[in-house]
A protein has these predicted regions:
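Ser/Thr- (and often Asn-) enriched beta-sheet segments in non-cytosolic proteins
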Residues: 41-43, 74-76, 83, 145-147, ...
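Pocket-edge structural micro-motifs
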Residues: 46-48, 177, 293
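Sequence/fold signature of self-assembling virion shell proteins
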Residues: 5, 148-151, 186-351
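Alpha-helix boundary/N-cap detector
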Residues: 6-7, 100, 104, 108, ...
Length: 351
């Protein structure tokens, strides 16, 4: 069973969840239009940020226009395709059944597709992380990434909220993170209600999405993207025959949803007859003229992040943070603050 188990694809799950959310940036009309758009350029009308609005201190009979400037955002598509074949006669007198082999092939190919789509979602977050921080609190940033020293690892989850709020994103926050952040949250959970210090507020108001495709740079142990709710989405489109659900010359096209991937993808099925004697070695040596089934799945994907016409001056809803690694075999210490240090001599209580 462990040869086909999936990992967590938190970035992909996050984009899909946000696409289906009530406050999604993707309208049902855009979703339907995109699905059948292959062969066309899809553009989304948007309105640019206007920093030139003037507030007057006098009344006047002449009211300024304050017109908006519109633009068109062209969707960028990436194609993903997977597939496998089956030779039905090969399962006669075989310990592995047709259904067993089919399910394993379906699982491994869709797992590979889910992993590729998850990597694409992480890349979209990376490309759209904010370049603007109204405040960094007590942190530094390098390359638009917040650098969290080891001593402040227990504070960054809580500090993400005021950093986001200062950037005018008070919405609740999603964290797309890796195992290092999971480890940190579990340590904070040991200091919950009725314990020495209640650290639940650091992480309680976050929605957590884990993926191994958020990777740590050297000397880091924990990387995450914090994203304000309602600011990302994902669009798919299928080939024309899949949308038409064509049946012709023993070929069949359709639109389906695969395991692990709650997105519409195009499917293509057909059969052919040929020499299948080499497909499974001696077990199929006699299949010099046999039927082979072909199962193919493909989809075009566009990752969307809320439009920003002035990324160098207007904050994006995505913050990336990296936590510095501790030395090996060194535990994470919780900070201890001495509030009455002035009552003790310089050398300590026993000096």
């Amino acid at each position: 069973r462990n040869m086909f188990r999936p990992c967590e694809y938190g970035a992909l799950d996050f984009f899909i969840e946000q696409t289906n959310a009530p406050n999604s940036i993707i309208s049902p009309n855009l979703r339907d239009r995109a699905l059948v758009s292959i062969g066309n350029t899809v553009q989304v009308p948007v309105i640019n940020y206007d920093e030139n609005v003037q507030v007057s201190n006098v009344r006047s009979c002449v009211i300024a226009d304050n017109e908006n400037t519109s633009a068109l955002v062209t969707l960028v598509w990436a194609t993903y395709a997977i597939g496998f074949t089956m030779v039905p006669a090969a399962y006669s007198n075989n310990e592995i059944s047709y259904q067993h082999d089919f399910m394993r092939k379906m699982e491994k190919t869709t797992r590979a597709l889910a992993d590729a789509l998850d990597k694409g979602a992480v890349a979209a977050l990376e490309a759209n992380k904010t370049q603007v921080f109204k405040t960094l609190l007590n942190y530094k940033e390098t390359g638009n990434v917040i650098q969290v020293p080891t001593q402040m690892a227990t504070e960054i989850l809580g500090d993400i909220n005021p950093i986001m709020r200062a950037n005018c994103y008070p919405e609740y926050i999603h964290l797309i993170a890796n195992a290092g952040v999971d480890s940190l949250i579990r340590k904070l959970a040991q200091h919950g209600v009725y314990n020495d210090v209640n650290k639940r507020m650091e992480y309680d108001n976050k929605v957590l999405h884990y993926t191994n495709n958020v990777t740590d740079e050297e000397s880091k142990m924990g990387t995450m993207f914090a994203v304000a709710d309602g600011n990302v989405g994902i669009l798919t489109r299928v080939d024309r025959e899949a949308y038409r659900r064509t049946r012709a010359n023993f070929h069949e096209w359709d639109i389906v949803r695969l395991p692990y991937i709650d997105l519409p993808v195009g499917s293509h099925y057909y059969t052919a007859v040929g020499d299948q004697s080499a497909i499974m070695g001696d077990a199929t040596a006699d299949l010099t003229c046999a039927v082979k089934e072909y199962f193919g799945f493909s989809v075009d994907v566009a990752y969307m992040v809320a439009y920003n016409s002035k990324q160098e001056t207007v904050a994006n809803p995505i913050i990336k943070a990296e936590i510095a690694a501790r030395n090996q075999n060194e535990p994470l210490g919780m900070p201890v603050y001495v509030t009455n240090a002035g009552e003790f001599p310089a050398g300590g209580a026993g000096a």
